[in-house]
Amino acid sequence: MKHAEIPPPPDAAAEVFGPALGAARRYAEILAGAGVERGLLGPREVDRIWDRHILNCAVIGELVEAGERVADVGSGAGLPGIPLALARPDVHVVLIEPLLRRSDFLREAIEDVGIECSVVRGRAEDRSVREEVGPTDVVVSRAVASLDKLAKWSSPLLRPGGRMLAIKGERAAEEIEEHRRALAALGVSELKVERCGARFVDPPATVVVGFQATAPEKRPRSGRRQR
């Protein structure tokens, strides 16, 4: 198959990725090559591979703290997890993907690009996946499902006080109102919309942020004396 020509990275990419720019360029080549061949990226997306896909995902690093453990649910072609790992080598990213052909692609991609990510094959809601991944500080996702489903998958992976970051579109605020009650039932609250990367991508990435409730404080039963 003849691969589409990949546009050069915009100037912003050098600032976002720093010394990892070469690795980001290699990832763009993989997406435009094997990613298109395996049906993980549409061929028409190659022309906007930087702004719409790679940079759009990388800039959510603005919402992640150094040293945090991040899980990417339904990672697919590695978006947003791989660009985030490239832009933020100070965090550890786990890519979660249920389909074998996609998880194989992810393993091949991270080895080729040369970044330290983990790949876990399975569904985020599966107990075995939760046990393998362990408690995480942040769960990220992009174009995977509605907010209520994302919260159902993300919540069990998050430590108390952890955050769900979902890259969404123009309806982000409407989705929050539509699913607020369902998210609250799962312990996800303090919902808000953040815009990331205004200096690097136009339009900025739209991210729904939700916080996992902390464990309720245990109090002695009324009438019982503490010892």
Swiss-Prot record:
Superkingdom of the organism of origin: Bacteria
Name the enzyme group at the top EC level. transferase
Principal subcellular localisation of the protein:
cytoplasm
This protein's GO cellular component annotations are: cytosol
The family assignment reads: Belongs to the methyltransferase superfamily. RNA methyltransferase RsmG family.
Identify this protein by name.
Ribosomal RNA small subunit methyltransferase G
- What pairs make up the disulfide bonds? none
Kindly state which keywords UniProt assigns to this record, in alphabetical order.
Answer: Cytoplasm, Methyltransferase, rRNA processing, S-adenosyl-L-methionine, Transferase
One Pfam short name: GidB
